[in-house]
Regions:
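ATP-grasp fold ATP-binding core
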Residues: 125-131
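A charged N-terminal "starter" segment
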Residues: 1-117, 121-125
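Active-site loop/helix belt of alpha/beta enzymes
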Residues: 115, 132-147
Length: 147
């Protein structure tokens, strides 16, 4: 039998078992947690919808993924918006709706400052991505120094 590519084979029973094991481990170890599923990894609507039913948030990195998350039933407050190429309208929409946004770069800090000034009573849910030279801080303990 010939299949078109890409071709995904998903064992629903194993996926359910693994997902429940992850949730159980997080409940035991962390208590207060949320799982975000990366649309970039595999945005197959069946898979995303299956995981949404288990309570995951949508983790998106583009306007297309953001739109897909909405089309699959994720509210803005169930979206984590990552990545360095966000557009300002979706940046503001996610934050104003109570979603989580991880900021990348000075431009987004400027947008955040302007948005906060325009909505002084609103609380925003943000993360800040920080990059640093891990090999310099931990010499010989990373793969960065390997040829």
């Amino acid at each position: 039998m010939a299949y078109q590519t890409p071709y995904f084979v998903i064992d629903e029973n194993q996926l359910t078992k693994d997902f429940q094991m992850l949730k159980s481990s997080l409940e035991t170890s962390w208590g207060n947690y949320r799982i975000g599923y990366s649309f970039k990894t595999n945005s197959l609507p069946w898979l995303v919808t299956f995981l949404k039913a288990g309570g995951v948030m949508a983790e998106v990195v583009s306007d297309d993924e953001y739109s897909l998350a909405g089309a699959l039933g994720f509210s803005d407050s169930e979206i984590v918006y990552n990545g360095p190429v966000k557009k300002r309208p979706s940046f503001e929409r996610v934050l104003l709706a109570g979603g989580i946004l991880n900021m990348d770069g000075r431009r987004e800090l400027d947008w955040m400052e302007e948005l906060a000034a325009a909505h002084p009573t609103q609380t925003f849910r943000v993360g800040i991505r920080v990059n640093f030279d891990l090999e310099k801080m931990c010499p010989g303990q990373t793969t960065m120094g390997e040829a």
